[in-house]
Amino acid sequence: MHLSLLKAKIHRATVTHSELNYEGSIAIDGLLLEATGIREFEQVHIWDVTNGARFSTYAIRAEEGSGIMSLNGGAARHVQVGDLIIVAAFASMSEDEAKTFKPNLVYVNAHNAISHTNHSIPTQAA
């Protein structure tokens, strides 16, 4: 049996551009792609914290250090500049692989620069 587990996450990034007439995708600062291990053209899920929209697209590289988070094409209709989003990628793996797998979790500041990273999410308490 194979499981689908969270591979990588960019947490609470700020949308910098919304380009309806650009070829569809999300352009992500290259430093964030490197930190997460998300590959160019990999499917990603976008969860808009601001408006609740959830959709999928694919990642393309934006200039390193630019802070760009640009939703393009049809995806641009789901967000507005300034919205907070979570970008997530998943990987399929065996149960044995899943036992030791740790996701790459990247947390960013208001300018989409890396504030810190982690490989686990704290247990939620009541």
Curated annotation (Swiss-Prot):
Coiled coil: none annotated. InterPro entries: Asp_de-COase-like_dom_sf (IPR009010), Asp_decarbox (IPR003190). GO terms for cellular component: cytosol. This is Aspartate 1-decarboxylase. Heterooctamer of four alpha and four beta subunits. The keyword Cell wall biogenesis/degradation does not apply. Substrate binds at residues 57, 73-75. NCBIfam families: panD (TIGR00223). It comes from Xanthomonas euvesicatoria pv. vesicatoria (strain 85-10). The lineage of its organism: Bacteria, Pseudomonadati, Pseudomonadota, Gammaproteobacteria, Lysobacterales. GO terms for biological process: alanine biosynthetic process; pantothenate biosynthetic process.
